[in-house]
Amino acid sequence: MTARRILVTSALPYANGQIHIGHLVEYIQTDIWVRFQRMMGNEVYYVGADDTHGTPVMLRAEKEGITPKALIDRVWTEHKRDFDSFLVSFDNYYSTDAEENRELCEKIYLALKAEDLIAEREVEQFFDPVKNMFLPDRFIKGECPKCGAKDQYGDSCEVCGTTYVPTDLKNPYSVVSGATPVRKSSAHYFFKLSDPRCETFLREWVADLAQPEAANKMQEWLGAEGEASTLSDWDISRDAPYFGFEIPGAPGKYFYVWLDAPIGYYASFQNLAAKKGIDFDAWVGPHSTAEQYHFIGKDILYFHTLFWPAMLRFSGYRTPTNVFAHGFLTVDGAKMSKSRGTFITAQSYVDTGMNPEWLRYYFAAKLNASMEDLDLNLDDFIARVNSDLIGKYVNIASRAAGFLVKRFEGKVDEAALAHPLLEQLRQAAPQVAHLYEAREYSKALRLVMELTDAVNAFVDTEKPWELAKDENKRAALHAACSVSLEAFRLLTVYLKPVVPNVAAGVERFLNVEPLDWRAIDKQLSAASPVQAYQHLMTRVDAKQVDALLAANRESLQATAAPAAAGAAIEPIADTITIDDFAKVDLRVAKIVECQKVEGSNKLLQLTLDLGEGRTRNVFSGIQSAYTPEQLVGKLTVVVANLAPRKMKFGVSEGMVLAASAADEKATPGLYILEPHEGAVPGMRIG
């Protein structure tokens, strides 16, 4: 079979924070697939980089009193350390702030311009008069122009789900300085995604997407064929001051970070190609026969399935073979939380003494090819790792290796290796390979654990510890241990993409060459004696998990410290009279039912009891902070006399009160109000 040529990427982590376990879902998912492809003998390159440009990096560097370059260099070192700790096997890990990326950005931009796909337009934006800078969407907050909810970002309302432009906000303020922004016009550059050529191409390209959810989402964005295009042109420029690449021929204008970030995939590969003598153009040119896959989170599907392929298609590059999106991570059924200690950083996991392969295995046991979210249930994590990896898999070697080394000098009984159990394991190879290829890791590991159960059943039946007591059963002992260790070798082949360090330990003690998929058709040889068994993995101790949570838990005092130090908060509203306040009817309400709103990643639909003899329907933009299961049965506070509002999902008959920080990036979290014990539905608050 001819080896496939495959270029693989994961989304680029932003150079403004630490790697946490939510990030690791994607990198572990990608790495397992890449390691499997290498084991299959394919030529595969896995490249990544830090996403380094943009306003947040610039402002953080300013806050720390260092240059943006010093900041991104430090963060790169931290990110690379974390990826190495979790065995993420990049062939090249680079930075978007690299000369290769600058040149590629300029080349792609000029090619799109030559195709008449770049337009210059005047754009009115908010400008911070204190910081003397234009404000990106997420650095402006104010009141929603539709429902009036306060403290909403400049692009969308988390309460009613409305999207808008920043200049639509009422009473806006700068998250950076707290100042009231002014409106200013500026020339911006747009990629003309609405061009009929882009629409025609994207309708053809979407047909090859592997994930139905992604294809359906793209069809939703593209709209019905034959109707007017629903695609909007994309603003690819930002005004100085900005940390990034200046646009050719446009002084003071910079490429938007979301333009240069995906191009960073190619920049990293070009850097690798120069070092290894790879023909870069043969891999990424328009006639390339190589495969190209992007693993991403579902929140950035829009950029990777609309802008990125269209940019590549019309600038003279090949387009992605496919884009694979995954869901979000929750911990114990809830969004990761600093106060609960479940916002777990990669470094804290390692520092606590936790084995990275425990997490690799657990994530793999939960991952499939869909975009559904996955949950890290800590009790299940302990139980599954201890049961599957230690109790089932590692236990096979520990039960057989000692006898073989002590009684038979480590030499297997080759004649015994014709056992039907081993043929059963080998026959599973095509199915295991298919499941890895399809990214159905949970199914692959379920199958491998079924095979592991069969091997343990064999060991339990043969009872080598009993055979060892009777010298007349020496041959049976030799055969049982030989079959057990050969079975263990085959199981290790199947598990190697997930637990590569354990596999390396197995290779050493079994005295075999590095295992690849072809090793399934080989077997242990008496000419290469098995070495003394070395411990491969320890059990998870619940105390370690407790220590991990404690290490990541922030006290309320620590969380509040930035505000005390003078961080920007929403300005206090104008003074009102007691009569004004009396117009707002705040009531205690019980959450009777709660469910996610189909088609929205922000809203929850709540059924509330206000003691009126009927229930009310209320939509609330708190899905990022709570699961429906967490809210049912709780008491909360509602604006009861708010006029009903018709939304595309239904009518909302009130507003649930929730608190959040002015800068949710710096201090993430939404918190609904809960009355103390004793309050009952219908009580008025005043």
From Swiss-Prot:
Binding residues annotated for ATP, in chain numbering: 338
Positions of short motif 'KMSKS' region: 335-339
Keywords: Aminoacyl-tRNA synthetase, ATP-binding, Cytoplasm, Ligase, Metal-binding, Nucleotide-binding, Protein biosynthesis, RNA-binding, tRNA-binding, Zinc
UniProt entry tagged with the keyword Ligase: yes
UniProt: Zn(2+) binding residues: 144, 147, 157, 160
Catalyzed chemical reaction(s): tRNA(Met) + L-methionine + ATP = L-methionyl-tRNA(Met) + AMP + diphosphate
Domain tRNA-binding: 580-686
A GO term from the CC aspect: cytosol
MF (Gene Ontology): ATP binding; metal ion binding; methionine-tRNA ligase activity; tRNA binding
SUPFAM superfamilies in UniProt: Anticodon-binding domain of a subclass of class I aminoacyl-tRNA synthetases, Methionyl-tRNA synthetase (MetRS), Zn-domain, Nucleic acid-binding proteins, Nucleotidylyl transferase
Cofactor(s) listed: Zn(2+)
PROSITE patterns per record: AA_TRNA_LIGASE_I (PS00178), TRBD (PS50886)
Record's keyword annotation contains Protein biosynthesis: yes
InterPro entries, alphabetized: aa-tRNA-synth_I_CS, Anticodon_Met, Met-tRNA-synth_bsu_C, Met-tRNA_ligase_1, Met-tRNA_synth, Methionyl/Leucyl_tRNA_Synth, MetRS_core, MetRS_Zn
Biological process (GO), any one: methionyl-tRNA aminoacylation
Role this protein plays: Is required not only for elongation of protein synthesis but also for the initiation of all mRNA translation through initiator tRNA(fMet) aminoacylation.
Family: Belongs to the class-I aminoacyl-tRNA synthetase family. MetG type 1 subfamily.
Listed name of the protein: Methionine--tRNA ligase
Gene it is expressed from: metG
